[in-house]
Amino acid sequence: MSATTADCAAGHVTINMLPDDILLLIFHFDRMTHVDKLAVVNSARLRWRWHRLIHVCQRWRSIVFRSPKFLDLALICDPSTPVELIDIWPPLPIIIRDRINRHMPKDYAFQVAIAHLNRVRQIDLCFKSRSQLQRLASAMQKEFPALIHLSFDSDKFVDEFDDDSALAIPDGFLGESASCLQSLNLDFIAFPVLPKFLLSATALVRLTLQNIPDYGYFPPEAILTGLAVLVNLKYLTIGFGRPRSFPDQESCHPPPPTCAVLPALTFFKFQGASKYLDELMAGIDTPLLDSLYITFFNHFIFDISQLAQFMRRTTRIQTPNEAHVDFNYRIVKVESLSPTWTLSKKSGLSITCVAFNWELSNLVQVLMSLFPSIYIVEHLYVYGPRSFPLPWQDPMQWLEVFHPFTAVKKLYVIKEFAQHIAPALQELVGERVKDVLPTMESLFLEGLLPSGPVQEAIGQFVAARQLIGHPVAISRWKNYQVATSFDEQYCGVI
């Protein structure tokens, strides 16, 4: 199809009049628009369908295939795709992606992975049995030089239905070499020789190990050896799957004598025993770390001396301006946010304690030990369950929670806790009124009524503060789920 001079004079312009480089930019813009949409829905399993363009005409097909890198072209297939179907295409990068069927045929030989190992760029699979993982692992005993992303996970319920459920990556995987690998994600998958494997994966940017099974446990000093060479690592997650996955405290090894410096690390997430993390932190230095998320299980005495020292030398998360304390069923979560946090980049420190019968004193211990800058927090938010009762009923124990927050100016409390906190504050009379929250200027209570026992108790606290020259304004907190320290449009003064 072509446009005539008369068409141009009349303003009839077709897309075929555009030069190749302009068409290429249009294709690229279409791809980037698709990528932006995927970022919104957070789906890595969808990709730009470039093959639709090549079926429009021969010219478009030629333009697309001349710029595979610019358009980020790749062939997406599942592990059982016949090699013949791949060979009819140009030699583009290959992405192997599939949720493997439970009843995999015996000839499910992953032919693509074997025949085109030099082109496989990404593998993203979910396994439902050990035989499936073994089948793929046996096909991947050689190095995959183009592989940059590897993600293995298993059906989390596989151990309930399959006696043969020990999903583990065997020795010799990828020829024990992954020099180009940038992202490794394992979920419910054991990799016993991971520390040794990491020694060759020096290009890693993201390492995510979630729900590590018992048989995938590795001691802190072993993983430190592997981490020491990952100078490009920015995101690190180490999570043990269940409380029974954690080793006995007495069996843990002494802190490592050397330190692994991770110069690029900005995000670290851990789930496991406090002793394990304490030993790990004793051997790590992270000068750029600004986001730390920690979850402890079933420990009433936290062994965190090394972790506390680590926190003191991690200066990028030592300047929070607000803290969030969330009491939920069997969970206590304490989170501090830096003044520069955004909805897309929440930087700061988060500590979650999961236990069946945790003590309030443990929370105070964690606060004092891990939040050396808790004394400068100016905005404190207290959340909790709407239906489950708290493990303690003594209102006075709330004073223990508030005691470390000596710089708080604004306190936000949900309705369910107001009836417990108000009587505690009411007991602060005379000189004691300065012992807890001495700098508080505003108290926001969700669902506060003009009159009632809560209002009466708070009124006595306000009067006591007024007598010592430190008045407190009482306001109603309308919506605790969306209110923030920089946006108080949801708070209304009674």
Model region roles, listed by residue range:
Residues 1-494:
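Leucine-rich repeat
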